[in-house]
Amino acid sequence: MSWIILFVAGLLEIVWAVGLKYTHGFTRLTPSIITISAMIVSMGMLSYAMKGLPAGTAYAIWTGIGAVGTAIFGIIVFGESANIYRLLSLAMIVFGIIGLKLAS
């Protein structure tokens, strides 16, 4: 169950990371509320997942999911660069996440 909670926490990290762009420095109310709520719930779920997982593993996977998801969102929605170096770097993060899961 800890792994599922950690995965959902990582997805919520994507929500708040992308949401930061839409808050315009927290000057827009609705995106700011959504972003702050996602931050709180994501970190709460991360904390809960750490009850059953090593802290270093949980944190690394949480940030990895957030980083890869946010980068992919940026490529698809914001038209950010998708060059080979960026894609290979994202793939290495994914393989690192898989490795941490297999090692736990």
From Swiss-Prot:
Locations listed in the record: Cell inner membrane
Main location: membrane
Lipid bilayer topology: Multi-pass membrane protein
Stretches of the chain found on the membrane's Periplasmic side: 27-32, 78-83
Claim: Transmembrane helix is one of the keywords in the record: yes
Cytoplasmic side: 1-3, 51-54, 104
Record protein name field: Guanidinium exporter
Source organism per UniProt: Proteus vulgaris
